Regions:
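Active-site substrate-recognition segment that forms the wall
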Residues: 1-7, 136-144, 157-248
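Rossmann-like flavin
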Residues: 2-116
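Conserved active-site and cofactor/substrate-binding residues in soluble primary-metabolism enzymes
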Residues: 23, 27, 80, 108, ...
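Conserved beta-strand segments of alpha/beta enzyme cores
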Residues: 76-78, 127, 156, 181
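A conserved short coil-to-beta-strand element within the FAD-binding core of flavoproteins
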Residues: 80-91, 106, 127-145
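Short beta-strand segments that buttress and anchor functional surface loops
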Residues: 102, 146-150
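N-terminal Rossmann-like dinucleotide/flavin-binding domain of flavoprotein oxidoreductases
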Residues: 114-126
Length: 248
């Protein structure tokens, strides 16, 4: 309830938040690319950009107003006609009034990226404790003590100089142990990955990432033989069930 209330109250700060989010995303993209370059991580990364497509003039004009805010945050996008859309992605049908193309965007297989990043981290001395249940985090003087249970032992206590909480929706629970308040809430998304097993399907599937605002879906090409489609945001708490109706 508190998250939803704060979420609704933030609508009055839409312009400011949009600009700040864009700036943060651009910086994040720079740092991620640096990590990829430094570590030599291969994860089917493609620098073909992303294409936002619109089927009605009303949507397209709204996108123009949004684009003005994105530009204030430093994001460069190009306004396109229908013919220009088909030039960038010839595999689309001719049924759009216009679009916006972000050339600087990229896509990749995030599972490959994170798993290979973990291996790089371990090679550099990082110790991962998998399947650990954190019971408490306490700051004692200049030290941080973390107590956790593991499948092989109980009430293990480790001491650290610093603690960085970066645990997705679990950050709320961990920050509370330190007297902090991180008011975030899980939103469940759905995606399917379509295999492209032959040359015909590989040639017909779009190469450029696509975002259809009306249909609320985004697509990405993962290498030459996979096509991912994601969409739907479901506010369902910590429920991990996959609803068949959502997939359909």
């Amino acid at each position: 309830v508190s998250w939803l209330a704060e979420f609704l109250l933030q609508t009055k700060n839409y312009k400011k938040n949009t600009i700040q989010t864009v700036k943060m995303a651009i910086e994040s993209r720079k740092y991620m690319q640096k990590i990829v370059d430094d570590a030599g991580i291969e994860f089917d990364k493609s620098n073909c950009g992303i294409l936002h497509i619109y089927k009605s003039h009303r949507e397209f004009e709204h996108a123009h107003r949004v684009n003005e805010l994105l530009a204030l945050g430093g994001l460069e996008r190009r306004r396109l006609t229908e013919n220009e859309i088909l030039t960038i992605e010839p595999n689309l049908e001719k049924k759009f009034v216009g679009g916006y193309y972000t050339k600087t965007d990229s896509t990749g297989d995030i599972h490959k990226f994170t798993s290979r990043l973990a291996r790089v981290a371990m090679d550099r001395g990082v110790n991962f404790q998998q399947s650990a249940d954190v019971k408490s985090i306490k700051v004692l003087g200049s030290e941080v003590k973390i107590k956790f249970n593991h499948k092989d032992f109980q009430d293990q206590i480790e001491t650290f100089d610093m603690c960085v909480i970066c645990a997705g929706v679990a950050s709320h629970k961990f920050a509370k142990m330190l007297g902090d308040r991180v008011n975030i809430y899980p939103v469940k998304g759905y995606s399917i990955t379509v295999p492209l097993p032959d040359l015909i399907s590989q040639k017909k599937a779009p190469n450029v990432s696509l975002l259809d605002d009306e249909a609320k879906i985004v697509t990405s090409r993962l290498g030459k033989n996979r096509f991912r489609v994601a969409g739907t945001a479901e506010i369902a708490g910590h429920n991990l069930d996959i609803l068949d109706a959502r997939i359909k």
